[in-house]
Amino acid sequence: MLDVKSQDISIPEAVVVLCTAPDEATAQDLAAKVLAEKLAACATLLPGATSLYYWEGKLEQEYEVQMILKTTVSHQQALIDCLKSHHPYQTPELLVLPVTHGDTDYLSWLNASLR
């Protein structure tokens, strides 16, 4: 019999979604919404990020909160749709990064948290 707990999950279903918010209150509101709807298992909010980018031909610099959201492939589109519909930015940062490896216990918790 195989010991599932000791096995590596070779291709985790987990993904990390990156999103910036203009301030901590907005980031906390967005995080609370996606957590309540079980679209993300965890939201890490990192205040103090500085973003530089061109918008409509002008160099912009904004102080933002970087949101790191942990979810699964099967929840990623609903998470992106939710963030986009409740985000104050016209074009929010919404990037999905694949998770190629992770601790089995953490990945199991992540999956269970979204059920």
UniProtKB/Swiss-Prot annotation:
> GO biological process annotations for this chain's record?
response to metal ion
Q: Any idea which UniProt keywords this protein has?
A: Copper, Cytoplasm, Metal-binding
Localization in the cell: Cytoplasm
One cellular component GO annotation, for this chain's record? cytoplasm
On assembly, the entry states: Homotrimer.
Which HAMAP family does the UniProt entry name for this protein? CutA
Q: Quote the protein name from its UniProt record.
A: Divalent-cation tolerance protein CutA
Q: What is the lineage of its organism?
A: Bacteria, Pseudomonadati, Pseudomonadota, Gammaproteobacteria, Enterobacterales
